[in-house]
Swiss-Prot record:
<comment type="similarity">
    <text>Belongs to the FliS family.</text>
</comment>
<protein>
    <recommendedName>
        <fullName>Flagellar secretion chaperone FliSB</fullName>
    </recommendedName>
</protein>
<keyword id="KW-1005">Bacterial flagellum biogenesis</keyword>
<keyword id="KW-0143">Chaperone</keyword>
<dbReference type="Pfam" id="PF02561">
    <property type="entry name" value="FliS"/>
</dbReference>
<keyword id="KW-0963">Cytoplasm</keyword>
<dbReference type="GO" id="GO:0005829">
    <property type="term" value="C:cytosol"/>
</dbReference>
<dbReference type="InterPro" id="IPR036584">
    <property type="entry name" value="FliS_sf"/>
</dbReference>
<dbReference type="GO" id="GO:0044780">
    <property type="term" value="P:bacterial-type flagellum assembly"/>
</dbReference>
<dbReference type="GO" id="GO:0071973">
    <property type="term" value="P:bacterial-type flagellum-dependent cell motility"/>
</dbReference>
<dbReference type="InterPro" id="IPR003713">
    <property type="entry name" value="FliS"/>
</dbReference>
Length: 126
């Protein structure tokens, strides 16, 4: 029990250190990674029929994707920013549906979309 608590504290400190040292490009990478992790955890909770936990994790994933939407710069990003905004909006709608229908395939769909966006973002060097 104590080992798990210590591990969680270590992970939290590690995440905080990464965030405090990160440039804006890296922060977006961390957000996307966090979103993918929450989606995987939500899938596990859904499979284990842990309904409250599933709802919390999907809510966190929605919050992260909402944060990614807010970070878009439509003036500098132009058409790409608009396309990403619509994609993020779609992802959020699918997550709401996944939460109400307990459909893991919807979580998988959003995970695949977010992973594709993250792969593109990771390909940009900063």
């Amino acid at each position: 029990m104590y080992a798990m608590k210590a591990m969680k504290q270590y992970q939290q400190v590690s995440i905080e250190a990464q965030v405090s040292d990160a440039n804006p490009h890296r922060l977006i990478q961390l957000l996307m990674q966090g979103g993918l992790e929450r989606l995987a955890q939500a899938r596990g909770a859904m499979e284990r029929e842990q309904i409250p936990e599933k709802g919390i994790l999907i809510g966190k994933a929605i919050g992260i994707i909402g944060g990614l939407r807010e970070a878009l710069d439509s003036e500098r990003g132009g058409e790409l920013a608009g396309n990403l905004d619509r994609l993020y909006e779609y992802m959020i709608a699918r997550l709401v549906e996944a939460n109400t229908s307990n459909d893991t395939s919807l979580l998988d769909e959003v995970s695949a979309l977010l992973l594709e966006v993250k792969s593109g973002w990771d390909g940009i060097s900063h």
